[in-house]
Design a protein with these regions (language model features):
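Sec-dependent signal peptide recognition
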Residues: 1-9
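Formylglycine-dependent sulfatase
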Residues: 2-3, 18-251
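Hydrophobic h-region of N-terminal signal peptides that target proteins for export
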Residues: 8-18
């Protein structure tokens, strides 16, 4: 009986120790990324060895569903765990803190900080635009570089002819520039630098990459991975947009 009591206390002690050990959390958000990633099997030709390797080491949610096709409502939903139908946020505005019913909502990083003692970091695109990045917002303890689609072709030159006025957001292609000049490079560089500094644990770091958000510009080496004569294009249903509102064409 004494042994059973000792064993029970030992198991309880071990379980409490395990509960006290809080994991560091690195959350990577990729804007407009679909399932064309190797480990998700969305396209037979895609080459994504780095993210495939990362998925094996971490946690990959393979049955997660986007709450909205727009940035602001979708990101708000993710960070406060409420659907657009309950927040009333369906467009690129408003910032949820400006909605009276939501202004005091506790977000994911704030919950971790308050209840888990986490130090919170953020860089890139986590909320839409500048939301959550002002010093007065107090959404994160440490904030790194913001999101950017730059650089763009000189003089805002359009690389392809597109319907409805050659809008820059539906442009795509390559032009002379370096990967190191891209906003996402700066974001990744900052995040790696923070991790190399061995931050105080536990920590929550959210890293939001802008690409593959439109416009779809990349350096030539990425196009060279997919020669035109070998590329398998996705099947497109003829007239697929005929029964959809024009606004949805840009989603």
């Amino acid at each position: 009986m004494q042994f059973l009591r000792f064993l029970s206390l030992l198991l309880l002690s071990l379980s409490l120790q395990a509960a006290d050990k809080k994991p560091n959390i690195l959350m990577i958000a990729i804007d407009d990324q679909n399932d064309w990633i190797g480990y998700l099997g969305g396209h037979p030709m895609v080459k994504t060895p780095h993210i495939d390797r990362l998925a094996k080491r971490g946690t990959a949610f393979t049955n997660a569903h986007c709450q909205s096709p727009l940035c602001n409502p979708s990101r708000t939903s993710l960070m406060i765990s409420r659907r657009p139908g309950s927040t009333g946020i369906y467009g690129l505005a408003p910032w949820f803190r400006n909605v009276p019913e939501l202004k005091d909502t506790v977000t994911l990083p704030q919950y971790l900080k308050k209840h888990g003692g986490y130090k919170t970091y953020s860089t890139g695109k986590i909320y839409h635009g500048r939301y959550g990045r002002q010093k007065t917002d107090k959404e994160f303890d440490v904030i790194g570089p913001g999101a950017s689609g730059k650089p763009f072709p000189k003089g805002n030159k359009k690389l392809v002819t597109t319907p409805f006025g050659n809008h820059r957001l539906v442009d795509w292609g390559t032009f002379p520039h370096k990967d190191e000049e891209k906003g996402d490079w700066l974001i990744a560089d900052w995040a790696v630098d923070q991790l190399n500094k061995k931050p105080k644990e536990p920590f929550f770091m959210s890293v939001g990459f802008f690409l593959p958000h439109v416009p779809l510009f990349a350096t030539q080496k990425w196009f060279d991975l997919y020669p035109d004569n070998d590329t398998v294009l996705p099947k497109i249903k003829r007239g697929d947009r005929d029964d959809t509102p024009r606004f949805s064409w840009y989603m």
